Amino acid sequence: MTILERLKIPAIVISSVLIIIACQSANTNRILEKNSPYNYQDTLLNLDIAISEHNYRIIHKSEIGSAIRERGDKSFPLSTVISFCNITYAKEMMLINEQLINDMPCIITVRESNNGVIIGTRLMDENVSDKHEARFAARINDDLKKIMEATIL
């Protein structure tokens, strides 16, 4: 076996690994969380006000923690998922890219944890090829961050 034949398999393996690594998308963490200085109920009230002040309307609240408590786990930490919408922005989003409805960004969570009360959201992906979509995502992300900041001030 010649040196070239011996190096052929390792070269193919190394090349394949490098190609796989290069083709993977960047792992961006779009989850944003902040600690609230308020108790759970006050944080929820502050969030309701902040959402309204930023021209969004609450469309649904999923009180996950309360539901689990009602099923018998009385000490389960409280947690709520709040969905909200600005219909004008929703229309704009659908006109830019109708598939974005699958990534509806306007959700903020409030939960009790060992570290206190945590609020969180998932930001839209701004690293996209469509410049209109990227600008829209940046604007919505800015709103989400402002709503979260107003909640915990």
Residue ranges with predicted function:
Residues 2-10:
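Bacterial N-terminal signal peptides that target proteins for export
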Residues 124-153:
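C-terminal partner/receptor-binding element of secreted or periplasmic proteins
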Residues 104-130:
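Beta-strand/loop substructures that line and gate deep hydrophobic ligand-binding cavities in soluble
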Residues 23-59:
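Terminal, regulation- and interaction-focused segments at domain boundaries
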Residues 53, 59-106, 124:
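Compact, glycine-rich, soluble single-domain proteins
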Residues 43, 47, 64, 136, ...:
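Stable alpha-helical elements in mature extracytoplasmic
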Residues 11-19:
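Bacterial N-terminal signal peptides
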